[in-house]
Amino acid sequence: MLFEQIAANKRKTIFIILGFFIFVLMVGAAIGIIVWNNYLNGLILAAVIGAFYILIMVMSSSSVVMAMNHAKEVTSKDQAPVLWDTVESMAMVAGIPMPKVYIVEDASPNAFATGISPEKGAVAVTRGLLNKLERYELEGVIAHEISHIRNYDIRLSTIAIALVAVIAILSDLAMRMIFWGSLTGGRNNRKSDNNNSGGAQAIIYIVALIFVILAPIIATAIQFALSRNREYLADASAVELTRNPDGLIQALQKISGDSKKMEEVSASSESIYFASPLKSKKNKPGLFDSHPPISSRIERLENM
């Protein structure tokens, strides 16, 4: 059951990522139709901007994420021996280099990982998590975060965030070009061969325009769907490492029962946390939820 869940989650992720890239190209094609009456120009624009933005995002240092979330590096085992040993042992089991270790001075129990590859990985936990969890529960959480690093989830989420940003940029660019085109009479200079073709072009233009307007919303929903799927995969992978689903289950129960919200959370970092720092109590995932409901995660773990 465990390995079936892991395989199913990986397949689902591949479909989501492929769909995401196709969606970006569709947005580019729609913009090409709207602005130049030529979808190919839009495809090229989307591909160029997308490749450039993804490159910039992937090259960004994980230290930026740590700074945004007020995480301080643990530079020696003496500073946090239990945490250090747990990260070291889980990394060894996962077969990756030991990630850098950070602590966020916040009373709410939570954790996150960053780093686009296992060689550049880092794990951060809140002070509340260290104070609230037993050793075996902490192992479950750390195994979950180590799994994100081993599965290249941070790289995937970085690409997803970049693609959402690219779609927002393309959509905004299209609106500006339409505005300036309307002022200069750009589209009025395009003549149709006959009334029928002119009517068809108008319909295509309107459909493309609606698609471009809705694209940022749809892209955000796709990004969060990917995020929720990777959380399930990291849970399953954590059990593969610890061979103890109870530790992760009890950690999730304790975090769910804790009412404290994190004091300072970067909005752009919400999706990387172990559990939503906004403390959502939903039992069903919404389109714009970065995490699946904790009750759903526990149910899947209990069925392993």
Swiss-Prot record:
> What Pfam families does the record tag this protein with?
Peptidase_M48
Cofactors demanded by this protein:
Zn(2+)
Q: Which UniProt keywords apply?
A: Cell membrane, Hydrolase, Membrane, Metal-binding, Metalloprotease, Protease, Transmembrane, Transmembrane helix, Zinc
Q: How is the cofactor bound?
A: Binds 1 zinc ion per subunit.
Enzyme class, first EC level, given as a word: hydrolase
> According to the lineage, what is the superkingdom?
Bacteria
Annotated residues that bind Zn(2+) are located at: H144, H148, E231
The name of this protein is Protease HtpX homolog
